[in-house]
Amino acid sequence: DYHYFSFEVDWIIIKTDAVFYIIHGDPGENGFLAEILEKNHIPQTGCDNYVSKLTFNKKKFIEFVDNLEIPCAKQILLKKKETIDIERILETIKPPCIVKPNNGGSSIGVSKVNYIDELEKKIKIAFNEDNQVLIETFLEGQEVSVGVIDRNGKRIILPITEIISENELFDYNAKYLGESQEITPANISKQSEELIHKYIAEIYDNIELNGITRSEFIIVNQIPH
């Protein structure tokens, strides 16, 4: 029974002692499993359901990060039940821009839009993956990824990795089909490295991230976003 994380063997109910979950996306990263485990007082690896829900929802997490005064791309949120109003979108964001599902991972449904006449088509592609779509200004710069391990209350920031995609953006093919290069340590300035460490510390301290996490930044003029 997934509601209680128990199962039956030879008429005996086996209860779960602890859960080490590595499920990518829904229902692992979005807080669904974490909430069930917490309600049943079952220890688990990773973040609690509140943190998982916050970080999985791109718009909510951007708002949280923006309140910490960490630079972010300008964005606008669309909902599937609403009419796609291209003129209203263009009042806030113009191509080049990125269109992505608001909830989800692995860059599925993510597109770069270079021209206005592509915008509606790319929005519909993203809506195939989620009921909410986020449109962001395109940031031209170095893309980097950094892992963090929280072990026994000690935060360990791993070396920063630079990501060089063979495609227009770090899309699904670049992530999983080898169409990218990953360089560790990243070829970035000391200023950028220090800012990334600072931003990670601020995020960790304000939402109590724990376990193993990975954050991605795009560095524009030495400033990570």
Which positions does each model-derived feature cover?
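ATP-binding N-terminal substructure of ATP-dependent carboxylate-amine bond-forming enzymes
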Residues: 1-50, 55-56, 60, 79-88
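Active-site nucleotide/adenylate-binding loops and adjacent lid/helix of ATP-dependent enzymes
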Residues: 9-14, 52-142, 197
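Glycine-rich phosphate/pyrophosphate-binding beta-alpha loops
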Residues: 25, 107, 163
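Short glycine-/acidic-enriched loop or helix-start segments at secondary-structure transitions
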Residues: 30-32, 108-109, 145, 216
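Phosphate-binding site of ATP-dependent enzymes
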Residues: 114-198, 218-225
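Conserved metal-phosphate-binding beta-hairpin within the catalytic cores
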Residues: 204-225
